[in-house]
Amino acid sequence: MNLSCSLVLLGGGKGERFNSLQPKQYTHLCGEPLILHALHAYQRLPFVQEVVVVCEEQYRELFLPYSVKFASPGTLRQDSVFSGLQQVFTPWVCIHDGVRPFVYADEVIEVCSAARKTGAAALASPATYTIKSCAPVRTLDRDALAVIHTPQCLDTEVLREGLLLARAMDFSLSDDTEAAELLGIEPTLVFSNRVQIKVTYPEDLLFAETLLSKSSTYK
């Protein structure tokens, strides 16, 4: 199966919950910015044809040693994705958060393969916590729920149309595959059996450092 795709790497978030002077995606993990851990992993994948980094202009110097394109971030995540999408010229696109430094080749391959069948796919984990809705307060069936991560892979035109529809509806998307859902497409979920780290708080960085220092399989 031809898995050729572009990567849109999101590096425009401000990370206000991280309590740092710089955005968390540029905080160092074992000597290297978080976002570069993700970039290096994707650059090792031969089917990734091009990389678009969505970031503020002041951080672009960090990526100059690499063969990447740039796009400017927007107000919302979906605006940043749409901005990156303007630089994409392949039929398929993979979206990844710059604050998710752990990228596993087999999971990217599985997500991209699954997307070819339905038009959209996302990496996921089973919900393991008890989750309640707030209004009214009631317990949800966690067996029917999943936690969504990146990578997420979509047909480029499906994502573009879904993002435009969301904008026309003034609708805030929770993730990228929700753009496909707006078009009536049911995304495929690819379940991971690994710990999926999104660095949101300082404690997440400590956990990531511990995991990385003890792992020989991170690739």
From Swiss-Prot:
It catalyses: 2-C-methyl-D-erythritol 4-phosphate + CTP + H(+) = 4-CDP-2-C-methyl-D-erythritol + diphosphate. One of its GO terms (biological process) is isopentenyl diphosphate biosynthetic process, methylerythritol 4-phosphate pathway. Pathway: Isoprenoid biosynthesis; isopentenyl diphosphate biosynthesis via DXP pathway; isopentenyl diphosphate from 1-deoxy-D-xylulose 5-phosphate: step 2/6. Keywords: Isoprene biosynthesis, Nucleotidyltransferase, Transferase. InterPro entries: IspD, IspD/TarI, IspD/TarI_cytidylyltransf_bact, ISPD_synthase_CS, Nucleotide-diphossugar_trans. Belongs to the IspD/TarI cytidylyltransferase family. IspD subfamily. This is 2-C-methyl-D-erythritol 4-phosphate cytidylyltransferase.
